[in-house]
Amino acid sequence: MSIGNVMQQMLEKVNREFPLTEKSAGEFAAIKAKGMKFVIKQYEAKGLGNVSVMEAKGFFGLMQMDTLIINPLERDLPLFSYDRVLAMGNDTLIIELYDTFVEKQDISVLELWKEENKNLPDHDLGEHWYDSIKLTESVSKKGKKEHSSAFDKFTAAYFEKFLNSDAAKVVVSDVKVKNEKASVYVEGLLSNGGPSTDVFKKEFGEPKTAKLFRKVLFGTEK
């Protein structure tokens, strides 16, 4: 299965639980930066929040990156960020969850799934400014092509558990507070940077990158 198919299945899963309506990504629908072509789509997930996907290809097809972001403003889930990168024979899987809970929720089912799959090769991401709000249920793996099928299966099950968790059933009591918590992460990315953030800031400048992040990728601003 290609990584694009994995992300498509994730979108379909969201759509079954929280019907998706595509929104216009405007000037960001198709962009180029640092030798990469990006295709970006944004959705409103009914009863869930903002969903965005980004597909990037470059370097004569030698690199492919898929990103799926969920800012769950209407359910008390953590902010969800999925990245999958195929490059130079390596397959990297990163799922990051950020604490945007209005009230602490139980997502221990994800930690149990991580533990069941601890044999999959880990990837040390080092230390970052956002570590204090990144949840322990986050995942970072890196392997070769022979690991791709296992990564696919792990991701599908992890995402299923995420959207079927008890937290996914909790309707947010205060959307404003929820959005403020998500904004802490988004504004932190813009201020402190990150791999993708830095690429966009260098290519488009800070104001345009801020617009992409706030209005499209994370939907913290309408």
Regions found by a protein language model. Give the residues of each.
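A generic structural signal for solvent-exposed, polar alpha-helical segments
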Residues: 24, 44, 49, 88, ...
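Polar low-complexity intrinsically disordered regions
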Residues: 1, 180, 221-222
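Short Lys/Arg-enriched alpha/beta "domain-start" segment
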Residues: 1-75, 79
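Mixed-charge (acidic/basic) macromolecular-recognition segments
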Residues: 94-197, 201
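Aromatic- and glycine-enriched beta-alpha-beta binding-site module
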Residues: 60-120
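Short, flexible helical or helix-coil boundary motifs
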Residues: 14, 18, 162, 166-169, ...
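A sequence-level detector of short, solvent-exposed, charge-rich linear segments
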Residues: 29, 170-173, 215, 219-222
